[in-house]
Amino acid sequence: MVEGRPFPWGILRERMGKLAQNYQGPFLVEGVGGWRVPLDSSLGIREWAQELSLPVVVVARNSLGTLNHTLLTVDSIRQSNLTLLGVVLNDTSPKPDDSSITNPALLEQLTRLPVLSLPYQSTQLPSLPAWLTPL
């Protein structure tokens, strides 16, 4: 349910189909709240991503607890047989703590995925790494 109404799967499927017919470039489809968030009583973000068969980029906050949440998400995405391109970490605090400093390298090592770490309230994005340039 979205705002008390059934989730509009049919409309989304139709619009994504038209978009795919008319546009050859990459698609960016944003999830909400996390990989396993339900969108209605039977389907969620994971199932939507599986239906679309698009590559996945995990976006996570860079703070204490991120390792566990991100590793669980990466494992679930891999079990879903989807292509996982990498992880983007957003710094959500102006004062980095020890975990936010070590998280990027640890996640690269533990997931064997590229990790892009974005600084707190950056006004200018860094150059995109090669694994994100198709997006």
Positions of PLM-derived features:
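Short glycine-/polar-rich loops that comprise or flank the Walker A/P-loop
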Residues: L52-P55, T83
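Structural motif
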Residues: L28-E30, V57-V59, V88
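ATP-dependent carboxylate-amine ligase catalytic core
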Residues: M1-L43, Q50, N62-L71, D75, ...
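Active-site phosphate/pyrophosphate- and oxyanion-stabilizing loops and adjacent acidic/basic residues
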Residues: R46-E47, A105
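C-terminal lobe/tail of nucleotide-utilizing enzymes
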Residues: V74-L135
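Short amphipathic alpha-helical segments at helix-loop
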Residues: M1, P55-V58
